[in-house]
């Protein structure tokens, strides 16, 4: 949240996947509809700041993410993901709505077992952190990537 809060509006280096997603999304919504950082995050932070509401990250911290990444992602998985990204850069991502594009992109990436395992571990961490916060907070608004929502809800139940 701190990076989004302090972003100066200047262009920044995107990952290849952000670029592929943005190009595919642009075909549906046009140039003005593609925004990074995502408006859901930046708007939530602005409203939280105005109302003096804490913004708390629930995803893995950098150390946990790095450990999970190195445990789950092999060199072969990285190679396959690179080829997948290259292929999707050429052909785009199927979908008629931004949601379909996001879900189809994530589904393709998660077809690689290491990346699927990494996302499962991220979702588990997010659910654990929400449970921790629910003991401290009366109300919680969680902004979760659409590709993780169903697994996140399942993990909470």
Task: Please report, for each region that a protein language model flagged, where it lies by residue.
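Compositional signal for N-terminal targeting/processing segments
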Residues: 1-157
